[in-house]
Amino acid sequence: MKSIPIILLVLIGLLLASVYSHDILITEKGQKSLDKLDKAAATTLQHGENIQLSCDVCQIGASLLEDFIKKNASLTEIIKGLSDLCIASKEEQPEVCTGILNNYVPIIVDVLIQSDFTPSQLCGYFKICSATGSSESSSISNSFDNEYRQESFNKPTMKVNKKPQYKDLSNQEPLVKKFKGNDSIGYILQISDVHFDPDYKVGSNPNCGRPLCCRDGVGSAGPIGHYLCDIPFSTVELIFQHLATLTDQLDFIVWTGDNPPHNVWEQSQAQQELATATLAQVIQKTFPNTPVLPSLGNHEAYPADQYVLPNSQWLLDSIYTYWAPWLDADALELVKERGYYTSLIKPGLRVMSLNTLENDMINFYNLLPTYLKGPNNQSDWMINTLEQAQSNGEKVLIIGHIPCTVKSASTDGWCAMYEQVVGQFSDVIIGQLYGHTHYDQFSVFSDVATHTIPTGMNYIVPSLTTYQNHEPGYRIYQFDYSTNQIVNYYQYHANITEANETGALNFQLTYSAKELYNMDDLSPTSWTKVANQMKTNSTMFNSYFENLSSSPIKESCDQACQTKWICQIFGITSSEFDKCYGV
């Protein structure tokens, strides 16, 4: 999920105010704007991490930056100024302020200097200001959207303008030699967002005032876990002891990333690598003879969410090593070069694992003009792979981490491209399996021309971590290999409160998709019908809402809340969400 605590988003506004000079604070105009900024920031902060950063914070900061953009300051001065402001706000502890700023400010400043964006446009890019707030702020998302739509493809055939040479995929060896199910029916396990914390301490304080707790102090952190914290490694072991009982049923496993904990202010490259290495070892030990299809999460990066080549080559080198037991040489070669790959699951069925750090709004490197259009970019590879699959009579299952929903803090440029690809190859793509939000969601893709014809389905699975009030969960998809279609899925959860009391972690079936929504099949058309019924059928919507967070905290959802969540289903880009929501 979005990893950076709200203080960093507030500091984006503050950074815009001082990125070039701490001297702005001593001017009369700058001081007045700063006073307003402090007040707006405090108002934003007191509502907690799940509330969007106030547009005022960002706009005032942008105004200050634009007034003093010609002045220069060192990174040391910028970080010190921001640290002083952060610590003075008392909304984060000093070590969190300094840790986050030291990690992220050099990247943000470097990107601002290299990019062509004005500070006001950044407020729109980060979705801090809506389209109704500032035409300049909202223009940046539309600019990314339009550039992808107009320049990446030749309409209406969606061919890549300058297609590089890619490997012939027609002779790949399948990963699954023999399926375990009866007749044509098999089962796929998806796990995501484990976020285990090796420093979790039983009996520690879950309300420590930092972005991640249960690591020190005295409090109610239970032996199995706590809803405000990431799970201990001992709980990971319990989870996989349970999953091991499913081995005889599973044909393959989809592992959609986010392995390290949420201590984003004090992480290191070595810690990020160790988290992935540890989980890879656990998975391989638990399922020694079951194929595993991994994808890269935003938390695997260091700092979290930040990815650009060649700076991030260490990350690709590490997953190349840890994913090696499951992927063939061609797939691993592409992993080491780009962080994505394709493999043949069985004749006629292919997987594409995407590197969705390119779809991460909090990856500041995505502001650079080359991220969408560089040589051998991911969108070109994606289209080429789908074209080959289409020619070879194959169906494709897409897996990734960050989905295209407003909840996931995705980028409109990427999602505009992706939406077109899904529409163009709707006869090839049979489903999309993602994670990241920690919520149990789904989104329906439709044709970009009219948004009336369903074209694809994205299934977003809940997390295994309990962080931010979730019961740990995993999902099993029922798959018909004769038609290469997902025909049902089963969502499982464990109750952490009960587990802490009994010492046993028991997973129970929460629901079956077909039974819960009374569906004949899981086609995009059927899911569109379900989503539209939620607009008027409160019973159906309440079933969806209850399973969204799988939280012990039961919240009410009024009409505005209901509309928001339904628009998340249809809003692949922020402009589509806003249109649905009536913004």
Curated annotation (Swiss-Prot):
Zn(2+) 2 binds at residues 258, 298, 401, 436. GO terms for molecular function: hydrolase activity, acting on glycosyl bonds; metal ion binding; sphingomyelin phosphodiesterase activity. Residues 51-133 form the Saposin B-type domain. Residues 1-21 form the signal peptide. The keyword Chaperone does not apply. The keyword Repressor does not apply. GO terms for cellular component: extracellular region; membrane. One of its GO terms (biological process) is ceramide biosynthetic process. Binds 2 Zn(2+) per subunit. Glycans are attached at residues 72, 182, 377, 495, 500, 537, 547. Its cofactor is Zn(2+). Its EC number is 3.1.4.-. Keywords: Disulfide bond, Glycoprotein, Glycosidase, Hydrolase, Metal-binding, Secreted, Signal, Zinc. It comes from the Eukaryota. Disulfide bonds join 55-129, 58-123, 86-97, 214-229, 567-580. Zn(2+) 1 binds at residues 193, 195, 258, 438. InterPro entries: ASM_C (IPR045473), ASMase/PPN1_MPP (IPR041805), Calcineurin-like_PHP_ApaH (IPR004843), Metallo-depent_PP-like (IPR029052), SapB_1 (IPR007856), Saposin-like (IPR011001), SaposinB_dom (IPR008139), Sphingomy_PDE (IPR011160). It is found in: Secreted. It holds the Pfam family Metallophos. Belongs to the acid sphingomyelinase family. Converts sphingomyelin to ceramide. This is Sphingomyelin phosphodiesterase A. It comes from Dictyostelium discoideum (Social amoeba).
